[in-house]
Amino acid sequence: MKHKALYLYLILFFLLCCSVTTTGQEKKQERFTLMGLGDSIMEGADFFTCYLYPLWEKLFTAGYQFDFIGPRESKCRIGTLNHCGFSGKNVEFLESKIDSLYRLYPADIVLLHAGHNHFVEEKPVPGMIASYRSIINKIQAINPNVRILIAQVIPSGKLPKYSYIPELNEKIAEMVAGLNSGQVFLVNQAQGFNWQDYTVHDKVHPNKAGAEKMATVLFEALKKVLASSETVFSPEIVRYKTLEDGDSLDRKSTRLNSSHKAI
């Protein structure tokens, strides 16, 4: 009887150890690819900042290994970033190109922000939503495992041209909710984005603070989609030049945390 009890205790101890070991083995995020899909807000220009730049910094600092991919390049302080941003083009244009684009650049994650380059007089929202749906379907037909983050786009002070954007954002949210997909995620870039504070003189494109805000929102959304990173860095921002307009050029001195703690 004593031997039987000891045998049972040993089995329970073994099962407990297995349970603890399995729980402790948290899955880490493997290297992944991202496609930024959109218009000039995605592409960037000489007079405003593309939010993919600060997003790159946030992902890198968090210890993720990743690549931005696409046929187009934009220069920034970290070098060049690849993307699928097309200045002056709308979501219908992206829909017409996405099949060939995604076959050439089958990213693990697609970041879609495209709601501008229409006029309110066109009553464009129904057609735009149809294009969003088609983009999703075409991408998923090529890669069923792709994760798509669709943004409710940033508001604009260029009115009445862009006065359709609030309606568009409402319909985007309804569309994503209706899809009920574990692979398509809504990102609310409109909430808290005050164009008076966050856009350049044209009242459309993000300034440095606006790009930083957009990158923060998208980074928080990505953290819910990604597994934990292997490492985390602690950047120290050093200001080495102040421009005439009060903006600054910063350099990040990045070091690895001694604890190697994943976030």
Where are these regions (language model features)?
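Conserved SGNH/GDSL esterase-like catalytic core that processes O-acyl groups on lipids
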Residues: T33-M35, I41-A130, L159-E170
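Sec-dependent signal peptide cleavage junction
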Residues: T21-R31, E230-S248
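Extracellular serine-dependent O-acyl
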Residues: R147-Q152, Y164-H201, E212-E236
